[in-house]
């Protein structure tokens, strides 16, 4: 869209060169979020009105995937319970139910999952050991081989420099090779907490946090509850 292209031009691309037009970038992102919210609301209304249509099942599946960590468990259940009994037995409903179950694991308002990861010293440690009680925490999932992930790191460095004392950042890599992960951390100058799930797409990050692609992040409130996901 034109708005997304404007964001790339005004904020994302300049940030790669160390130029952070933060105020302008945030203004565009807020507008992008408003557009997305209106689209999601319209999709939800369509599903309610056409709750006996297979098309609504397809839309519901897309909505669940695109709003993970934005919907609460109650909202997910409300969406799923809104279909007619006849549609509950449709073959496509099985796929939608599986998606809904995955999204419940990372629903907004749910508590974060404490998983065991590896730190830079090679120690197996619980994620909770790196959480900062009483503060907002951000889990940033990435990998050294992921070009979009590497492209996001300048933004993360800037965020750490500006908000590092009050906002706890934890990057969690899904690199399977220890050397690749550590080399990337050093190359990118990532000074905040660094952990790794070397089981990759089959490890606890993929299972407990439903991370099927990177980069992806989840923000937790001071009580360890999920506030939102996919924040950029």
Please name every model-derived segment.
Residues 135-137, 141-161:
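Conserved redox-active cysteine motifs that mediate thiol-disulfide chemistry
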Residues 165-180, 190-202:
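Thiol-based oxidoreductase modules, predominantly thioredoxin-like and allied folds used
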Residues 190, 197-232:
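Thiol/disulfide oxidoreductase modules built on the thioredoxin-like
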């Amino acid at each position: 869209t034109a708005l997304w292209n404007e964001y790339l031009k005004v904020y994302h691309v300049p940030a790669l060169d160390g130029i952070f037009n933060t105020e302008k970038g945030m203004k565009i992102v807020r507008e992008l979020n408003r557009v997305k919210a209106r689209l999601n609301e319209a999709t939800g209304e369509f599903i309610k009105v056409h709750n006996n249509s297979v098309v609504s099942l397809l839309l519901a599946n897309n909505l669940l995937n695109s709003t993970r960590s934005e919907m609460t468990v109650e909202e997910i259940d409300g969406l799923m319970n809104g279909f007619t009994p006849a549609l509950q037995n449709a073959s496509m409903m099985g796929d939608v139910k599986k998606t809904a179950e995955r999204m419940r694991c990372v629903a907004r308002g749910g508590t974060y999952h404490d998983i065991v990861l590896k730190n830079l010293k090679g120690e197996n440690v619980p994620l909770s050991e790196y959480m900062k009680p009483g503060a907002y925490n951000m889990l940033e999932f990435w990998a050294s081989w992921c070009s979009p992930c590497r492209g996001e790191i300048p933004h993360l460095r800037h965020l750490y420099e500006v908000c590092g004392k009050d906002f706890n950042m934890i990057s969690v890599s899904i690199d399977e090779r220890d050397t690749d992960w550590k080399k990337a951390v050093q190359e990118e100058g990532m000074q905040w907490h660094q952990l790794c799930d070397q089981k990759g797409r089959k490890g606890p990050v993929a299972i407990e946090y439903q991370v099927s692609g990177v980069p992806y992040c989840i923000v937790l409130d001071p009580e360890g509850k999920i506030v939102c996901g996919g924040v950029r």
